[in-house]
Amino acid sequence: DEQTGSKGPNENLPSQKDLXAKASXLTEV
């Protein structure tokens, strides 16, 4: 699953995803 990006990319995305989600507000993923 690490190759599929279940832990690697996901761990690096949380920061951008959270910011985006908070900035959008509409997209709470």
UniProtKB/Swiss-Prot annotation:
It is found in: Secreted; Nematocyst; Target cell membrane. Pore-forming toxin that lyses bovine erythrocytes at nanomolar concentrations. Is devoid of enzymatic activity. Binds to monolayers and efficiently permeabilizes small lipid vesicles composed of sphingomyelin and cholesterol. The cytolytic activity is not prevented by cholesterol or sphingomyelin. Its main location: secreted. This is Cytolysin Uc-1. Keywords: Cytolysis, Hemolysis, Ion transport, Membrane, Nematocyst, Secreted, Target cell membrane, Target membrane, Toxin, Transmembrane, Transport. It comes from Urticina crassicornis. The keyword Lipid biosynthesis does not apply. GO terms for biological process: killing of cells of another organism; monoatomic ion transport. One of its GO terms (cellular component) is membrane. One of its GO terms (molecular function) is toxin activity. Residues 1-29 are annotated as: Disordered. Residues 1-15 have a biased composition (Polar residues).
